[in-house]
Swiss-Prot record:
Species this chain originates from: Salmonella schwarzengrund (strain CVM19633)
Bridged cysteine pairs (disulfide): none
Pathway: Amino-acid degradation; L-arginine degradation via AST pathway; L-glutamate and succinate from L-arginine: step 4/5
Superkingdom, natural source: Bacteria
GO MF entries: succinylglutamate-semialdehyde dehydrogenase activity
Gene3D superfamilies: Aldehyde Dehydrogenase, Chain A, domain 1 (3.40.605.10), Aldehyde Dehydrogenase, Chain A, domain 2 (3.40.309.10)
Pfam hit, one: Aldedh
Record field: catalytic activity: N-succinyl-L-glutamate 5-semialdehyde + NAD(+) + H2O = N-succinyl-L-glutamate + NADH + 2 H(+)
Keyword field: Arginine metabolism, NAD, Oxidoreductase
EC class (word): oxidoreductase
Protein's name according to its UniProt entry: N-succinylglutamate 5-semialdehyde dehydrogenase
Protein encoded by which gene: astD
Amino acid sequence: MTLWINGDWITGQGERRRKTNPVSAEILWQGNDANAAQVAEACQAARAAFPRWAREPFAARQAIVEKFAALLEAHKAELTEVIARETGKPRWEAATEVTAMINKIAISIKAYHARTGEQKSELVDGAATLRHRPHGVLAVFGPYNFPGHLPNGHIVPALLAGNTLIFKPSELTPWTGETVIKLWERAGLPAGVLNLVQGGRETGQALSSLDDLDGLLFTGSASTGYQLHRQLSGQPEKILALEMGGNNPLIIEDAANMDAAVHLTLQSAFITAGQRCTCARRLLVKQGAQGDAFLARLVDVAGRLQPGRWDDDPQPFIGGLISAQAAQHVMEAWRQREALGGRTLLVPRKVKEGTSLLTPGIIELTGVTDVPDEEVFGPLLNVWRYAHFDEAIRLANNTRFGLSCGLVSTDRAQFEQLLLEARAGIVNWNKPLTGAASTAPFGGVGASGNHRPSAWYAADYCAWPMASLESPELTLPATLSPGLDFSRREAV
């Protein structure tokens, strides 16, 4: 029984599915997808649960969410292993994901009060009050790269605001989704407040097509995000929050501290085997001897990176990609760029055929035309050389995406220029592109999102503002508007 609907675990009636470890092929999870009728049933359960949940005092909702945080802490080792085995990422990195899930609770509570709490301004004849109200029933679509943390960033603020939810994890990480939902069940969520539907494209389409949804919160690829945007066009009554990918530039202007610059680049491009939406995809390196030396050192150090199993000892820096198919897609993208005229600096290699273990690849594309403006979700770094900083910014902005951008330089003025001219939601200076703070908004512009950033700003799309002018008494104004006559006439 792999679906959780209205507080009950039930068996899916859709397609049979199984999940294996992307390196060992060990079967980790088996179950059936939710069919369209079960998706509709989950929505009905969420709708029925909404009035009571929305009317619960905030303190009651907070108590359940904090109980969930305590359960995450108590079961950290178990959830870490589930995430690591299912995604292929090393145990150390999966542990940081669970820590981020735990930290998200306190941050979301603070964000709720800071961004969507109640504010009152006293007036001469009453008060002006700003309150926030939940949307109702929301669908949450989760990605596979951070199958615990990223859905958590939607689910927690949505529940705190008083919404009820239908959660569809990625079909590539059903085990993590199920494990997390079982902790929510133990936290004491009332039946119907949070529902789990497993499945792939058909389940997702059934969910996003429901007329009774009040909104949809999505983290994933730009292609799927665009499909959802088209599907919900003409429905302004529904909130739609899209957190999509990026073709992110990292500018290396000054690499005098060579190894520090190389370390920052490795963290930006290859952590999580390149499967972070903020990963550097385009490396812009200044022309000259220093840039040449930097690239040589980068290729040297990156060439020593050996991906390994989730439980290897010692732990590797990177593990496997989500699937062998994903690794093959990266290889095909590299070959395509070679065919366009790219010069390979570091050849990506499959460690073992049939697995998702893939070494990093680096290819220079200076002067190459018709390079696809796409997010290759894996350890492939494209290099361009530039002559002056204005050219670097032009290259950085030469993309339909706009998620993250970074600069390695000692010149504050260059960073200030980048802040003014970069088209990206995250702009970092001498910090990895993959570094982000939950106390700041997380999101981008262009093909990277629809101006609904998450993290600290997730509270914004989980509730709508209600403005009130209020007074306990009804009084006639001392001064009336022109043309109004309230004088009493004597009866004739």
